[in-house]
Amino acid sequence: MAVSPTTMAAVRASGAVPNAEYLLSAEGVRKEFPGVVALDDVQFRLKRASVHALMGENGAGKSTLMKILAGIYTPDKGDIRLKGIEIQLKSPLDALENGIAMIHQELNLMPFMTVAENIWIRREPKNRLGFIDHGVMHRMTEELFTRLNIAIDPDIEVRFLSVANRQMVEIAKAVSYNSDVLIMDEPTSALTEREVEHLFRIIRDLKAQGIGIVYITHKMNELFEIADEFSVFRDGRYIGTHASTDVTRDDIIRMMVGREITQMFPKEEVPIGEVMLSVKDLCLNGVFKNVSFEVRAGEILGVAGLVGSGRSNVAETLFGVTPASSGSIELYGKPVAISSPTEAIRNRMAFLTEDRKDTGCLLILDILENMQIAVLQDRYVKGGFVQQGAVEATCEDMAKKLRVKTPNLYERVENLSGGNQQKVLIGRWLLTNPRILILDEPTRGIDVGAKAEIHRLVTEMARDGVAVVMISSEMPEVLGMSDRIMVMHEGRVTGFLNRDEATQIKVMELAAQ
């Protein structure tokens, strides 16, 4: 018999902790959405004072299960147990009251409120007159930060914080509920290497305090560094759980994809043609200066550099999002002035942005609506009318080519996994038949199987004569996919490396100049 959230919260508050082997567990869980079985008889078991990683391709069911454990979704079938007692979680508030907190990949803080106000929202300490006691709230926040070894001013507005510090605030907020379980969804996707190290120190401190942590990630190195054990999901099913010390990287990949991935970077030697894009002394005041390079047909130019080096800003300028202050751009041997994305598209350029959710996908629209955006003004409009049948057929073919996992084209993009959202974006731009393709972090937050598929697509486009500019923070991707590598540091180009001479050390030396 399941215990109500209120009853379980009372048991938790009393300190009467059942003698259970697992802090949190799920057995026989099933969840269906229209046309899709997201979870089918899955299980999960989290031990106290441990880090348990969840691995699997996009759409494997990881996030769905975690949303069930966080009270966001309710399961169609199955049992959830907290410290051995079966519970029912009908809302995120139920989960919080029972000590289960989830830190989402998309952070949910109020930008114009202070750090302290965000942490204690709807739980603010009051003075005798019933007003918020900001002094007490400040001290409570400082005490919490001291416990977590976080150095952030409680009175600063969140909008002034870096992504890493916002994440620290989210963690502190979750801990402030006296949580026994923290669920972290891709917590390092937008962090630098140093910020990741800081996050891991905090995770280890939380683990030492007896907290159990569920860690969703696609990054193998993180699993081996921070996780005690891991579980793998595939196609909505539970595959297995192992100690992270008992397996190799290849073992995990086989469990995730159910097959061998023989070529993660299927780079081909293709004929390099004429110059398609030539940039000379391009500047954007206060951001980057004197950027010069060229890309030829069939060539993949990798762009490497640390966070803040200006790589994404250059991409946005090339695509007309932020017009340059000075410098020149030539397309196909002719000078052009690109002042808007519409003009860039007209010149057969395509740009896959690094932030698919904020500046890429229109989440509330369906797959068809997202894919057709870039082509409706062109070949599918005749006599002022859209040839909707032709549009749908073309988008259907593209979705099949990219292996987008969906029941149909009318599924809202917000319901897709991160990897499938990225495929929808790629499909949108492939429909424009581009001659120049700019990719900014094309495989960020995507599982190993989807990465290999996207690398294959990029290779095919290069083979077809497309000039590719690929910005990536993943060194194996840059080294494995690029014909040449351009390295940037603090808004300037510090050097170029050919494929046969490029090494991780050489790239990092140029990136740190």
UniProtKB/Swiss-Prot annotation:
InterPro entries: AAA+_ATPase (IPR003593), ABC_carbohydrate_import_ATPase (IPR050107), ABC_transporter-like_ATP-bd (IPR003439), ABC_transporter-like_CS (IPR017871), P-loop_NTPase (IPR027417). SMART domains: AAA. GO terms for molecular function: ABC-type D-ribose transporter activity; ATP binding; ATP hydrolysis activity. The keyword Phosphoprotein does not apply. Residues 24-260, 270-510 form the ABC transporter domain. GO terms for cellular component: plasma membrane. It catalyses: D-ribose(out) + ATP + H2O = D-ribose(in) + ADP + phosphate + H(+); D-galactose(out) + ATP + H2O = D-galactose(in) + ADP + phosphate + H(+). It is a peripheral membrane protein. CDD domains: ABC_Carb_Monos_I (cd03216), ABC_Carb_Monos_II (cd03215). Its EC number is 7.5.2.11, 7.5.2.7. Disulfide bonds: none annotated. SUPFAM superfamilies: P-loop containing nucleoside triphosphate hydrolases. Its main location: membrane. Keywords: ATP-binding, Cell inner membrane, Cell membrane, Membrane, Nucleotide-binding, Repeat, Sugar transport, Translocase, Transport. ATP binds at residues 56-63. Belongs to the ABC transporter superfamily. Carbohydrate importer 2 (CUT2) (TC 3.A.1.2) family. This is Putative ribose/galactose/methyl galactoside import ATP-binding protein.
